[in-house]
Curated annotation (Swiss-Prot):
One of its GO terms (biological process) is translation. This is Large ribosomal subunit protein uL15. Keywords: Ribonucleoprotein, Ribosomal protein, RNA-binding, rRNA-binding. It holds the Pfam family Ribosomal_L27A. Part of the 50S ribosomal subunit. GO terms for cellular component: cytosolic large ribosomal subunit. Signal peptide: none annotated. It comes from the Bacteria. Gene3D superfamilies: 3.100.10.10. Belongs to the universal ribosomal protein uL15 family.
């Protein structure tokens, strides 16, 4: 195939189909929409969840669960996340916010034992699980309530 042997496609030359422009166009009168009914009208759309008048699935199934409002204010930190910041000796809520480890809206933090900590740190004003407390104290750290 060469550039000089290329020709326009038959479909390229064909003009755009203009519906509802007289009987002679082939798409006159109803314009491909059929006769009457909701789908023939302008703006006549049926939502995806419509089941033909039958009670829809989202109303047949019972409600369950809820979104807790407390979730916005509580967070948990793992021990290995604290171990990543080697220059921190003293840890409290405001310091965790400064180093972007928690969101600014968080008011309560709990430290959980996931991983190990190998250096002494001082934790104040944060709740700590039993396992995390043992791990911190065995590394030479202190947990203040």
């Amino acid at each position: 195939m060469y550039l000089n042997s290329l020709s326009n496609s038959v479909y390229k030359k064909r003009s755009k189909k203009r519906i509802c422009r007289g009987i002679g166009s082939g798409w006159g009168k109803t314009g491909g929409r059929g006769h009457k009914g909701q789908k023939s009208r302008s703006g006549g759309k049926i939502r995806k969840s419509f089941e033909g008048g039958q009670t829809p699935l989202y109303r047949r199934i019972p409600k369950f669960g809820f979104r807790s409002k407390k979730k916005k204010f509580f967070d948990e930190i793992r021990l290995f996340e604290l171990d990543c910041f080697h220059n921190l000796k003293y840890i409290n809520l405001s310091i965790l916010k400064k180093i972007n480890l928690i969101n600014k809206n968080i008011k309560y933090v709990k430290i959980i034992k996931s991983g190990l900590i190998n250096r002494p740190i001082i934790i104040s004003g944060l709740s700590v699980t039993k396992g995390a407390r043992l791990c911190i104290e065995s590394a030479g750290g202190v947990v203040k309530s």
